[in-house]
Amino acid sequence: MPSLNDSVKLPCGLVLPNRLAKAAMAEMLGGFQNIPTPALINVYDQWAKGGWGAVLTGNVQVDVNHLGTPFDPSLSGEYIDAETNKDLFEQYRKYAEVSQAHGTPAIVQLCHPGRQSPRGAGRKGLLGSTMAPSAIPLDMGAGFVQRWLSWLVFPPPREMTQGDIETVTRQFVDAARLMADAGFSGIELHGAHGYLIDQFLNPKSNTRTDAYGGSAANRAKFVLDIIAQTRAVVPSTFCIGIKFNSADHHSSSFEDTMTQIGLLVDAGIDFIEISGGSYEDPKMFNSGLQQAEKSARTAAREAFFLEFSAAVRERYPTLILMLTGGFRSRAGADYALSQNACDLVGIGRPAAIDPHFPKLLLDESVQESEAELHLNRIPVPFWAKWIPLAAIGAGAESTYYTGQIQRIAKGLKTIVPL
């Protein structure tokens, strides 16, 4: 059975020193200029010292006009390097240097939110439109209140033109090239949680009838083009991974999902991170609510997407898989590895409480009963209970842990939810 302490070599040749990856989380530390601020770099200085096998950053948006939050780090949408924008390039170079100062590879999560860009987030302004594969607004519930609140927060998207698709593809490629030039070890394309790449992959949000819609393969064309064009401009040793939503075994989309994963494998993807959820179905954002007991059965429940990951492993045995969502203990992480369901264990919220969490899990002198971190549910604000949106409760969870990340940035002690 693999050990958490074992190294992992990705197809590109990048070696991760152990199997614990700090998963991407929203830091909201890009400031009003949406750049890698000193506060953001302070946080990654702590994670760099934490003993992780890999550190995945929070979202870096590829177009400052379309952000997931008003404070996401982002790029202008145009290619930059040390000559075209020396100051911004230097900020990303410093970000990479600090994040990897202690030998842990840092991988940047690149994202475009598509229709999940709230009003006022990005330079599109309050009245600017979002874009999506098809002009289908977010469906956050059938009731009048849900529909009104959804419209209030997320403007209805316009369908992307061929020119839009080519522009956004180039923005992803240019962003990846910048990260390689700045010294990061790789990128992860955010293809989950309802963001733009996921919107193309999903038939519910992509009803196009051109080369980017219809079949599972056509719906994957957008991300496959990004991968192919990125490979052409970055070193062969630069990692390209993707975060990918799980699918229910019994759903009609399961085989389509497996087909798309196969296309990603054929494209030479270095790893796939299995995750899940979106603003319409925020199960991922409610992760971390189970408490680990000392049984294998409970340890298995720590991994929310274990069954799907195991199915992917069976279909594509050589694919490097990262499983994220719910891990709180060594027992849970060991169980996932023992089931051959993943190669890497992604840990999010515990990293926002204890940036050095791997040191506890990897220290074999620490008893298994002590190698864990209990995190209780964050209470939903009383006013939110009157709003019939599942995303409200999920937002309370995410906001709490973003706040803990910001405490780390200030050098303050984090607060464990009890």
State the predicted function of each range.
Residues 1-418:
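Flavin-dependent oxidoreductase catalytic cores
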